[in-house]
Regions:
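Alpha-helix N-cap and loop-to-helix initiation/capping positions
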Residues: 3-11, 60-63, 88-93, 119-131
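Conserved N-terminal beta1-alpha1 strand-loop-helix module at the mouth
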Residues: 1-63, 144-145
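Alpha-helix-loop-beta-strand connector modules within alpha/beta enzyme cores
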Residues: 31-46, 95-108, 133-135
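Histidine- and/or cysteine-centered catalytic micro-motif in compact active-site loops
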Residues: 30-32, 51, 81, 113-115, ...
């Protein structure tokens, strides 16, 4: 819940002109600021922070792929550590979202990473591998090539 609409607008106005074509640069904003970010971003990729794995239905407070696409958002973060920690998202949930996003020709940004306890136990590689394998279950190689993996340790 960082960045209000006004703060998002100011950020995009300050950063967007500085973006070069040497890399893909983006901002993921809360839902309410997505349209503001899209309106101001000429060079920045604008991503949603989350999406639901169903096309539609009675999922109060959730946002569908169709809703995001309607406002021009084509990138979405999946499996962020905060979603896993505070909302109980699982590898299976991330996979369901991944399949939904890819089916709708959007670009998923799949977050993976270990906790401090897992790091200290020396299981980082196993944890991250498990998360990646689960996220990409039933994803064709061509579709996987349209995705991004973001490594972010949870500590």
């Amino acid at each position: 819940m960082n960045k209000t609409i006004a703060a998002t607008k100011a950020f995009v106005e300050a950063v967007d002109p500085e973006v070069t074509d040497k890399a893909d640069w983006g901002i993921a904003t809360p839902y309410l600021a997505l349209q503001t970010a899209k309106a101001g971003a000429k060079n920045l990729i604008v991503a949603a922070e989350n999406v639901h794995f169903k096309d539609s239905g009675a999922y109060t407070g959730e946002v569908s792929v169709e809703m995001l696409k309607e406002i021009g958002v084509e990138w979405v973060i999946l499996g962020h550590s905060e979603r896993r920690q505070y909302f109980g998202e699982t590898d299976e949930t991330v996979n369901a979202k991944m399949l939904q996003v890819l089916k709708n020709d959007m670009t998923p940004i799949v977050c993976v990473g270990e906790t401090l306890e897992q790091y200290e136990a020396g299981t980082t590689k196993d944890v991250v591998k498990t998360q990646v394998v689960a996220a990409y279950k039933d994803v064709c190689p061509k579709c996987a090539a349209r995705s991004v993996i973001a490594y972010e340790p949870v500590w």
